[in-house]
Amino acid sequence: GVCALMAWMTGKYGVSLLLPLLKVIGAVYLGCLLHVLGVYSSLLILLARLNPLHYFKSIVDAQAVAFTSSSSSSTLPISLACAERRLGVSPAITAKVLPIGATINMDGTALYQGVTALFVAQAFGVDLHVVDYLTIISIATLASIGTAGTPGTGLMLLTLTLTAVGLPLEGVALIAGIDRILDMARTTVNVSGDILVSVLIARSEKELDLAIYHDASVGEDIDFTLR
């Protein structure tokens, strides 16, 4: 189905329309990388007074599963194990925060909505006004609050975004061809953010085992069997 859509778009608008898709992939991945390394690191340092390097080292397995599965829900067991056994977050915190985080706190999805909507506008030569930008921001925010943690959900939300600002829905066919690649990046951000929130809450509630968090040997013994 996606192949047929891409073939139709190429025949109608030419191959030159597909080349900028590489820029979209680069923009989404760069945005996700800056968000994780910049925003998440800053939150750990400023709000929790914790070393972000330990955090990133401890969640690498959850990020790997998120990247390959493109599903926050499928990554949930690994996220729980990383948060509890590698970061020292209390099970009482992870049991509440991470399952909820699988459907909300979708920062990567919000970033994806903004970048792809702007790409579609440029690809079809549509000029956006201030109101349109505000609409995109609003929908992206709503997308980050509540989205199913399954692959491809962001693409369905993109249809809503394009419709809201009057952009042609043919743009969905363009994005569909690379959506899986983009989904891998945004899911990694979503999962990383969920674990981060559990650490911040545990830290504020004094439910964080600092001995485990700062353990230099973390990751050497990989056992994801949940207690």
Identify the role of each PLM range.
Residues A7, L30, L34-L46, V120, ...:
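Alpha-helical membrane-inserting segments
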Residues T10-K23, L44-F56:
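Interfacial helix-loop-helix linkers and transmembrane-helix boundary segments
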Residues L30-C32, I45-Y55, L87-T94, G125-T135, ...:
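Membrane-interfacial loop-to-helix junctions in multi-pass transporters
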